[in-house]
Amino acid sequence: MNLEQLYDVIVVGGGHAGTEAALAAARLGVKTLLLTHNIDLLGQMSCNPAIGGIGKGHLVKEIDALDGAMAKAADQAGIQFRILNASKGPAVRATRAQADRVLYRKAIRTQLQSQANLTIFQQAVDDLKIEGGLVTGVVTQMGLTLKARAVVLTVGTFLGGKIHVGMNQYAGGRAGDPPSIALSKSLRDLDLPVGRLKTGTPPRIDRRTIDFSQMVEQPGDTPVPVFSYLGTASDHPQQVPCHITHTTEATHDIIRNNLDKSPMYAGVIEGVGPRYCPSIEDKIVRFADKTSHQIFVEPEGLTTEEIYPNGISTSLPFEVQVQFVRTIKGFENAHITRPGYAIEYDYFDPRGLTSFLQTKAIPNLFFAGQINGTTGYEEAAAQGIIAGMNAALQIKDQELWCPRRDEAYIGVLIDDLITCGTQEPYRMFTSRAEYRLLLREDNADLRLTEKGRQLGLVGDERWESFSKKREAIESTQALLHNSWVRVHHNDLFKEALLNPMQHDCRAAEFLKRPEINYQHLLMMDDLNLPELPQEITEQIEIQNKYAGYIDRQQQEIEKLRKHENTMLPETLDYNDVVGLSSEVIQKLNRIKPTSLAQAGRISGVTPAALSLLLVHLKKSRLPV
């Protein structure tokens, strides 16, 4: 059966990538359809009930700067908030929220249902309609054909999903949900480069069977942080503590003695698991010298008794899970409400994508999320907003966009994927970015909101709030630059100054001192500085205190910008470039980098190879 209505964009999958993709496309004004196998599970947190963390929190702030949904939902669902690396520099500080699963789903669904140009329909997709090298729609499980001018696939772990508990295995997209077997086969028939990955989740435990007196309480931060630039602490529900416990040597003995029953170690699972979120079996084997491992005991919500024991992801048989869980401090009488499991699923080599997340083989087919080899809600959502936006821009015949590596962690994420690919689930860290000092959580809006407004992503409320904030920062910085702190002010600041001033200096220069903050300057009545919110004074302080380092990174970026702007034609045959090794030729012909800078980030492409490319471009009279 055909549904005659033509949609501009169809998004397949209602997880973190799919919801951001659908909202982004709809915000750009195109007719968008979001397809999900279960409307009640839109925005479902399939694994850990948390948002943010090192690198991940930066992505959430960037999504928010582009008017995405994740940060707002986290504020409305967060039951504990913490700033990680709070004692370190601003580049690596990161917000993390423990979230109530039910409240998070509710917040996401509310945003979806209130979005203009967006329709939600409950149907799983079994096939794509391809005509003339383009996707023209999708076919659902009940045989319904839905037409579209562009399709975004955000199918998570559902493609060919297989769940493992011990030696038992069964088809599933996640616990309790069916896999996408037919769609997996359809995509494999398109001859796209496919692989298998694996992830896992720990058993859930009944809170009432836990002895918290044996654990260390971990309270949230006060004052309570917020994720969204539009958020306030009043958005948060009731705040609750988490706890920390540890495995014991008895735990390790049980796991070691049952490794032959682990599908991972028995060779049953072919997919590669996440390096930075290993199973408890992996930890015991890889870190054999450790006598204990830390476990974060995290509540799943305010209206459930289930606890998420972060750190014991496992696919061991259920009876073994019961045994080892009860050797953990405080879990001696634990009742497992849901077993832990591993799940294998299909992913497609992201080197088959452009930087706009469109497939090179089918230009109006976009991929986002775990289908591209990433792991994590935040990584998925970041890809979703870019894929949905670009699908809409393509429909509107406008220039597609993706942030550069020096503009956003989203740019780092996508460039890493499309340039290097991945053989294991990819997770974002601040260490992946060359320009961390520029890509801070606190300035994501200053980096991205204006561009988001130009693209049509950012609504009036956010734009007005951002414009006021930016104006306050710029006007205050000008005031600081044109105001002077005199030597006679030493007495005023004698409690704070590590060393007295030897000469007069501009207020902006005085603020560079590590012991001085904006509040100190307010003590000087003759400066006439305005009282400002904390998030604005923080930005002013960082811009001044780190000005030298920031300028240095900007200079490095300008040097590299020439390579970023040296475009490599898609039709360039690297076999024609004299002097390149066969390895480099093979990689360049496969990946087809769009710029000289991207070519330089491909493993094995040396500076000498880049010089040969430049010579070839000049000889061929191609634009350099």
Curated annotation (Swiss-Prot):
Where along the chain is NAD(+) bound? 273-287
InterPro entries in the cross-refs: FAD/NAD-bd_sf, GIDA_C_N, MnmG, MnmG-rel, MnmG-rel_CS, MnmG_C, MnmG_C_subdom, MnmG_C_subdom_sf
Gene Ontology CC: cytosol
Principal subcellular localisation of the protein: cytoplasm
**Superkingdom in the source lineage:** Bacteria
* Binding-site residues, FAD: 13-18, 125, 180, 370
Q: Does the keyword Cytoplasm apply?
A: yes
User: Which cofactors does this gene product need?
Assistant: FAD
Keyword terms: Cytoplasm, FAD, Flavoprotein, NAD, tRNA processing
Question: Mind listing the GO biological process terms from this record?
Answer: tRNA methylation; tRNA wobble uridine modification
Query: What is this protein's function?
Result: NAD-binding protein involved in the addition of a carboxymethylaminomethyl (cmnm) group at the wobble position (U34) of certain tRNAs, forming tRNA-cmnm(5)s(2)U34.
**Subunit text:** Homodimer. Heterotetramer of two MnmE and two MnmG subunits.
**Entries under HAMAP family matching the protein:** MnmG_GidA
Annotated protein name in UniProt:
tRNA uridine 5-carboxymethylaminomethyl modification enzyme MnmG
What taxonomic classification does the UniProt entry list for its organism? Bacteria, Pseudomonadati, Pseudomonadota, Gammaproteobacteria, Legionellales
